């Protein structure tokens, strides 16, 4: 697999402010498509400007006001925006793209690049991990014909996919590969083995290391482990990107961990979906932004992405305490049914509901169809 390169423009354009644009077709033309009179936002952060955009084949041929050449197709984008394709920074679309590579739900919203790897990536996989994936969610494949991350993305591309794709290598994925689901510190030998897996993924084109530290078994990795893996990423100019270890009461401490990883590993770092979760902790967000600004003034390359609404979405893995989940899914289920363990679990869950009342939690999906019919839409 070749390393993914981000282009300034995708030749797939999106225009807004009207459900349809006026089009005309010409036979003798200098270009395949000319989009006329739209407000161009070129991705640089500069102000939009009125211009025409001419496309030949799969490349932008020319941008400028009132272009003279005609297009085989002429699109009037007056009053509309012309933009580069959008990047889905945190995509979980790998399995759905295996089933249907057309990606209509994202393409029709203007997304032209899917970036995987928030802690978990499609590779590298062991035989045990493949068996687990087949039992859960692997698209329509009856087998998983890849091992490495590069092989996974090549398999997806060969099946056919409408978007561009890229991936971080998942810190969770390499930990499961080497350590499993045990809640313990990795040994020096295991760190070396994980580093080798990260190096292989970077050689194949991974864009960096992704972590998701509120979930098990990612939560079992200490900061030193993440620094060791990030140092490998730094050798290739990659970034460390993280769903930080806390987004509520320990938000600032969690950010401190990310900044330490960036400093000691010598890499740029990105915060996934920057936010302060739960209303009692919203006030922490201003302090966090100040810390990021200070780090950037000190020369650290730290950035963040954010969504624009005050809600979040996760599954039971983000709600059930990570100590319950140690050992993997079967051990987790057994522990939840243990009459000795259940009182401690209920106490932990009740403590969480003090700051996150249950009426603010909406149930939206179940793997079990009968449970879905009964509970979807309820709080």
For the regions a protein language model found, what residue spans apply to each?
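Active-site environment of divalent metal-dependent phosphoester hydrolases
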Residues: 94-97, 121-124, 214-218, 246-252, ...
